[in-house]
């Protein structure tokens, strides 16, 4: 199921102040509205290296419609389409598209499921996922308005995001 937190390369770049920055990893949390729901909300966090910020976090709403996942970014109105995807309990792959142009393949691995207390390696014993529940808060209360830095957010617009060319 899509439910849970996934980590990997989504081939995202951002432009800020005329400079292009590559996202090193994206962490996406999908929270369905109910059991077996095809809609929900969540968070999308893009991590950067070599920038004046470490990450940018966004609230998302998503829906599975006609064999694709439509992801809407609340703060900036951005929309992504995920198609031809395969999901199992530990792996999520497919193609990401923004403007109905060229799609790029992505691969993500599941790092957390907030509604379960066992891992995804079929060993069957419990664990505490300190990364997902500690370093990155599930409610993102420390992120505020989903910007990477209050100083940067107050002085400049957010980065413009797109799928790599």
State where each predicted segment sits:
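N-terminal helix-cap/turn-to-beta initiation motif at the start of protein domains
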Residues: 1-9
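Extracellular/luminal Pro/Thr/Ser-rich low-complexity repeat and linker "mucin-like" segments
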Residues: 6, 22-26, 135
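Residue-level detector of conserved, well-ordered beta-strand and adjacent loop positions
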Residues: 7, 31, 109
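Small side chains
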Residues: 8, 40-42, 94
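Beta-sheet ligand-binding and adhesion/scaffold domains
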Residues: 12, 65-165
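Structural motif
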Residues: 14-16
């Amino acid at each position: 199921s899509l439910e849970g937190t996934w980590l990997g390369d989504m081939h995202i770049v951002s432009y800020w102040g005329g400079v292009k920055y590559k996202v090193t990893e994206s962490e996406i949390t999908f929270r369905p509205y109910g059991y077996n729901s095809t809609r929900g909300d969540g968070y999308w966090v893009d991590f950067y290296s070599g920038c004046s910020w470490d990450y940018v976090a966004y609230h998302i709403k998503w829906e599975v419609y006609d064999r694709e996942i439509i992801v809407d970014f609340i703060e900036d109105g951005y929309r992504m389409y995920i198609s031809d995807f395969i999901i199992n309990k530990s792996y999520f792959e497919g193609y990401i598209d923004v403007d109905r142009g060229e799609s790029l393949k992505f691969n993500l691995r599941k790092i957390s499921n907030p509604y379960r207390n066992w891992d995804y390696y079929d060993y069957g014993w419990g664990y505490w996922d300190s990364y997902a529940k500690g370093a990155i808060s599930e409610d993102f209360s420390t992120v505020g308005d989903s910007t990477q830095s209050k100083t940067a957010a107050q002085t400049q617009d957010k980065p413009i995001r797109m799928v790599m060319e």
